[in-house]
Amino acid sequence: MRKHFKGAKLCFALSLSICLTLCGCEKKETKREIKAEYTLEQLREESKNFKAEYPNLDLSKTKIIIPDGDNIEELIFPVDINIGESEENFEKVKNNVYENIRLLTGKDKVEEKYVKYSACEKEVLLKDVTKEDRMISLIGTPEHKEREKERNIDPEESKSAYGFMIGYSDGDYSTLLWGSSFMCEFTNKRVSGTWKKKYYEAGHRPPDDNIVRSIDISKDSIDDVSYVLDGKEVPLKNAIEYVEENIGKTGYHYAASPFLTYEVIHVDVIKYGGDKYYYAMELKALYKGIPFSSDMYAAGYPLEGEVDYEIFSETHHVSMLAENSMDFIWSSANNYEEKKEGEVYDKFLSIDDAMYLVSNAVSSSTTLHCDRVELLYRTEFHKDSTYYCIKEVQCHPVYQVRCVNTGLPDYPVLFFNVDAITGMVEGMDTLI
């Protein structure tokens, strides 16, 4: 299983100037006693007039966000989609995908000629394999070992088989499920007219190379934003309301979770096919009003020690090519169908303690400008050690600190996650 280490990895990927900026290259001792002893109500009060100062952090323009409520539940979501485990599990996942296909196409019967199975073993992609080949490719049978020998694959290495794909594409509709990242896509290609390629010829997503307007929902007004979609004027505000209300009501497996709500955070208006437009929306997931980490650059690694899980940040994507129509859905790791009970926390580190820990992880020779500090959920992949498929996703409360105007050309934005219970500090995945 993948392990994440502190400074050696962090320093390896950075230029010397960046290495000198972050911890792992400059060791500091934490002298303050850190305890999780503050209620959410106390944190909300602390956030109102936060005036603490740190030698290497500029908080003059920092927005601090603390959720409502009295506690935060640690979330545990089983993800039972490892089709390499057994024939029974394979059939369960296959049946769910076939239900999706029937719902997507509106047909009672799935046309098998349009269904494809693929497997990934490390960087080896097996295309167009049968169900039997699929099982052999993931289970350590004699046939599997013989195939490894023929393809010159180390048997020990191939145990890290991490991906599978079940896909469908008939030219009008396509859908696929990836096991390695618990990602599912649904595409209705009929709307655009100019966009009718099979998945295996590429083009399974709407064309996105002509963005005419990019909108940050948290900052930009959308009151007057309106474009013609498939011959009809559709105000963006109406489109967003429809998607947020209906993304969880599609009936598809792996498209959204009944335990979560979703909010649009970004929209690109895209022109395609000459003079046609559509809305490409990015959504974040929330549990009882508390958001999941949604910035792809905010995934991290502990700056001290190691862990046996993978930290990640994910969003949903929905494209609307016609009014009240979700013509492309991309979901990944925020689409759980089951939930287990987790620990409920009602005491947390103070905001001051969290920022102190970040300051302690940053070189005293630099100053980082923090524009946002938010108490939210950080998500973790827990993967099977044999097939490297996701077995469980855990969501844990952290302070996420975003730093802007870093002065680093390749990294204008930096993120730190501070565990709101233990104080463990994580640095950015993109720096590793």
Functional labels for PLM-detected ranges:
Residues 4-28:
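Sec-dependent N-terminal signal peptides of Gram-positive bacterial secreted proteins and lipoproteins
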Residues 100, 399-401, 423:
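Short low-polarity hydrophobic stretches
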Residues 25-307:
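Preferential activation on post-signal-peptide N-terminal prodomains/segments
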Residues 228, 238-409:
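Segments that shape or occlude catalytic/ligand-binding pockets
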Residues 171-172, 176-219, 227, 311-344, ...:
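A short, surface-exposed interaction/processing loop segment used at functional sites
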